[in-house]
């Protein structure tokens, strides 16, 4: 509040009383610009202090006494600053207008709820204003109305959400406030927001109904529905029926191009033809898939690359394992044959050739029947049994007993396992390994010659068994003598309880290079051992010079050195472990493949020009041919027995039997 009052105004107040009255009357008719005073200045205690107060008269109308005459408790401002409690105003008897007051004054006090403020800064300068006794009666009402206006402004600014509610009671009693209150406004209508339903699994089962405007056609698949929308409803510019506004359930979407409206139609059709390669999600439009793919590229690029690398490694491992299994299955016949040969190479058991019965041969060779048949037919061709079987079919040799006798004599002469048969079987074995058959030779019916072939290969098998037994016996005798000769010096060396350590001589220090190191190790007359000793002091004598530092090194390791590895190697090892790639895995796989427990590198033993390993292979081949021939003989005998039974049955019956179809 501004309480600074110019003193000249109070000095001229008593002398110019008439002028002040004329001024008051003048302002009663027309409001001067000086009447626009602040509320704080107008409602100050000094402005409302009456000149009729006895306290002011006692002080001699002093401005200082008028400034301090009223206390702050009687001011209407303090009433406004207190809690809002609506006071109950009672009109006393003095509220009625007195006789000495004019009618204008009474009407002015009743018609104006808020009385006009004085034009001067102090009420003692305006006699008309000071002569109104009803001012203090209306003053609390004025303060209460001002307080209501302030509270209304406070509620309008601080509580905007309550301005549309209709308050009863307090505001309804104040007609002055309700006159200026605006009518409540209704909420504006928001535009309709388009929402699209998500496609569920049930939506993809159909049937699918066209909801374009008044069309009610039903389709079985969403693809046909989409084609119907594009062709019939959207149309084409060339057909003069192009429609770029979507009428699906009053969608109302309008586009500029036909491609845009056809792409928009996928939103309504439950069709998701665009699939993500990195996750199982599918999308209706290609732009949706493109937007989705960015999430994979931005969020998890490293994880995706790592997952792809791991997937590639897993696929490579599975492919390698499948390839290894296929190779093992393809070579199962050779592996089983080699294992049997390795067990029976040097056993010397005379019953080895008799342990191959028909059931074991069937079980061994049924896994790769094509290869077995090729081997058997090749062996029979080499021993001229195929030609002999075809001989009766040739017209030039039919009935010629000389050719049959010649072949029989040649067979009988070749039944012994000699060096010629050994070379022939070796040549055949090499041919089978280098030239694998592409197709199987057809089985041929040998007729009566199959018995001759079985007899020939049976005698040849017995001859090979005898040869193999004699050779294995000779090898065991030689091997036993060599092992005894090797064990004898070993036993002599083991007579000493503890082995002696080599020492280094004094005269070995003059050598240089590799001879110097050899002298350090091989000289046994010295006093220094060939192995390093940690922190051993060297002897010093006046006649012998101090030993050079090279004497302290043994293979690059010093006697004062605790570790021969540097710390850099450790760091390199850790980096190599981090950079572990598929190439290292391949190397490990190859190393593990080489760690097979087999005796492939068996030393070759040759006795009298026969290789013991080749003889074992030849024995297996002849046994295979012999087993095949025996199976053929059994089948022929079974067929003959069946035919004989049918003939016997037909001869015993007098009348033929009629069978029903």
UniProtKB/Swiss-Prot annotation:
Residues 626-654 form a coiled coil. Keywords: Coiled coil, Cytoplasm, Metal-binding, Nucleus, Repeat, Repressor, Zinc, Zinc-finger. Residues 12-35, 59-75, 98-118, 479-514 have a biased composition (Polar residues). A motif (YPX[LI] motif 3) lies at residues 655-658. A motif (Nuclear localization signal) lies at residues 290-296. Residues 567-586 have a biased composition (Acidic residues). A motif (YPX[LI] motif 1) lies at residues 498-501. It is found in: Cytoplasm; Nucleus. Residues 43-54, 145-163, 173-189 have a biased composition (Low complexity). PROSITE patterns: ZINC_FINGER_C2H2_1, ZINC_FINGER_C2H2_2. GO terms for cellular component: cytoplasm; nucleus. Transcription factor that mediates regulation of both acid- and alkaline-expressed genes in response to ambient pH. At alkaline ambient pH, activates transcription of alkaline-expressed genes (including RIM101 itself) and represses transcription of acid-expressed genes. Specifically recognizes and binds the consensus sequence 5'-CCAAGAA-3'. Required for the control of alkaline pH-induced filamentation (dimorphic switch) and virulence. Belongs to the pacC/RIM101 family. Binds to DNA. Interacts with RIM20, which binds to the YPX[LI] motifs and is required for proteolytic processing. This is pH-response transcription factor pacC/RIM101. It comes from Candida albicans (strain SC5314 / ATCC MYA-2876).
